Amino acid sequence: MAQPWFQVAKVVALPPAWLWFRWRFEHLELIPARGPALVACNHASYLDPIANAYAVVKAGRRPRFLAKDDLFDIPLVGRALAGAGQIPVSRGSGDRTPLARAERALAAGEAVVVYPEGTVTTRPDGLPMAGKTGTVRLALALRVPITPMVSWGSAAVWQKSGPGSLKPGRPVWVSVGAPIDLAADHDAILDFDAVRRMTADLMEVLTALTIDLRDRYPKRWADAR
């Protein structure tokens, strides 16, 4: 049932985004073309899911997101998210069901997109905050490499503090980094300190990629992130 809803979402959401923003995608070939793909992203804007979904779709994959459960309560939006196979997450509840569903999706060879921070960053510079351990635990449990992905440019439109500029033509850049393979550390999955260190390492990678993208972003739009 997920495929028809995914096609509807792709037709409804992506064309307007394509027309409104000026997109640049880098290194999409680093997203696995088949088999399980665990994509970990920075989160500077509420528009990030559109940018990240766009990149994953352009790479030839159907993304499944871990999304806030509040979104599933919105009429039509919630039905579309559930119908497209997205995974609701109740932040701070300790419920392990979303991770179990993500594990099943990865085991079935799907592409799962996660935001290790768990929410949009509150840092004034727009860089990633500390990450939660779920992404690393997924990678260790399934022996799946983490594919880091970062975006820059959409936060000026809609960030944590609220909606911003809707000026058309704003560049939105998305870049994919080299995969992070944690398979050799599989046995450390029960070592919480080790998992926290690996999570900190993941966030360092996402931060470095974000800084690189930010520093190359057009200066004319320097207010964006």
Question: What residues fall within each predicted segment?
Answer:
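Non-catalytic C-terminal accessory region of glycerolipid acyltransferases
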Residues: P4-W5, T97-R225
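A secondary-structure boundary/capping signal
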Residues: H27, N42, A67-K68, G85, ...
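Short gly/ser/thr-rich secondary-structure transition/capping motifs
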Residues: W18-F25, R96, A155-W158
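Short, flexible active-site-adjacent loop segments at beta-strand->alpha-helix junctions, enriched
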Residues: E29, H43-A44, D69-L71, G92, ...
